[in-house]
Every structure is written in C-alpha cells, then in structure tokens.
Design a protein with these regions (language model features):
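Conserved small-residue
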Residues: 1-90
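Secondary-structure transition into beta-strands, especially the periplasmic turns and strand N-termini
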Residues: 1-4, 101-111
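Membrane-embedded beta-strand positions in outer-membrane beta-barrel channels/transporters
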Residues: 3-5, 95-99, 178-180
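Transmembrane beta-strands of outer-membrane beta-barrel pores
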Residues: 8-14, 104-106, 115-119, 178
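C-terminal extracellular loops and terminal segments
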Residues: 28-42, 46-49, 87-97, 101, ...
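Extracytoplasmic gating/loop element in the C-terminal half of outer-membrane beta-barrel translocons
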Residues: 62-64, 116-180
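Active-site proximal loops enriched in glycine and acidic residues that flank catalytic Cys/His/Asp
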Residues: 83, 111-117
Length: 180
C-alpha cells in the first residue's frame, strides 16, 4: 500500500430567520413539469434550505399510492395548501471521499470513491409521465416508464398529483471514478 486518504463531512442546515418583513417561508427552486407554475421547494424558518413542500401521499394496503388522496395533516376535513409539509431536502447529510494507490512490484492500481448520503431529488420525469390519460394526446403516443404505468393514475381527480411526497426520492450514491 502506497497511499490511502479519506475525508468525511457532515452537513446540517437549518434556516433560523429570513429577511425582516417577510413571512416565515418563501418559495424557491424551479417549477415542476406538470404543475401549472407549481413550485415544490421552500425556504422556511426551522427547516433545511430548499425543503420539498409537498402533500403526504396515502397508500393502499399493497403500498401503492392512491391518486389524489393525501393526509389531512391539519385535521380540518379539507385537503388544501395548509396540509402541505416540509419533507426532505436536496442537501446531503454526509459527504465522503476515499482515494487509494496500491503498488506491488511493477504493478500499480489507484481508485477514487466519493459518496453523498441523505440527499433527495424530486423525480420530475416520473411526475410528468404519471398521468396515463396524457400518453396519447393529439393522436401522438408519448414515452413513459413502467413505474408510471403501474401507478395507474388517470387524471380523474382534481387534486394535483404533482405535489405528492411520492415523487421525492433518495438520491444517495457511491461512485468510483475511473480506475487506473
């Protein structure tokens, strides 16, 4: 073994205050594909930066999301924007790196690994393709994924499915850079 190095970093971020005169939260991030100018990320006091601001999806007994059905988080009997909540964020909790270089006689081997753990993304492609009724608009068939077909969302509800926490996915990874 010739050389081994590593690093580990922890990340905790929380908004403690916003500019004076503003409410305790502001919209941030890009609009989602199928959302009529809908944004799903906020900066809110007490939450991590760019938290996903979504509805809590309800699932059937088999774990399949039920189209347009969300948890009434404030208990007022109506699903509205007051039922949205901050769920996960795109910033990783842990970032790690490892580099190695091994030498034996006339042979050498080196590799570099890096990892990002605890970061989340909004799966906008699936959100855009999730409503099966949209697959053949204007006599043009569009591509989709098997997961979108299995969801079985037909767009028969007035509740927007694009603001569901179902589309927020874990994006943690471990990557090995080219090995030499």
């Amino acid at each position: 073994v010739r050389d081994v190095t590593y690093n580990v970093g922890w990340n905790h971020n929380e908004i403690t205050q916003l500019d004076a005169g503003l409410q305790d939260w502001v919209w941030t991030g890009d609009k989602v594909s199928r959302g009529n100018n809908t944004k799903i990320q906020v900066n809110k006091v007490g939450q991590p930066i760019n938290s996903f601001y979504v509805f809590q999806q309800v699932y059937d007994e088999n774990g399949k999301p039920i189209e347009g059905l969300y948890v009434d988080r404030n208990g007022n009997g109506t699903i509205d924007d007051d039922d949205r909540y901050c769920y996960k964020n795109p910033a990783p909790d842990v970032i790690m790196g490892l580099t190695t270089k091994f030498i034996y006689k006339n042979w050498d081997f080196s590799a570099a690994f890096h990892a990002s753990i605890g970061n989340y993304v909004y799966y906008d492609f699936l959100n855009e393709k999730a409503v099966l009724a949209d697959l053949s608009k204007d006599n043009i068939f569009r591509n989709t994924t098997a997961e979108a077909v299995n969801l079985g969302f037909w767009g028969k509800t007035t509740k927007a499915t694009n603001t569901s926490d179902y589309f927020v996915r874990n994006a943690s990874y471990l990557k090995c850079s080219p090995v030499c």
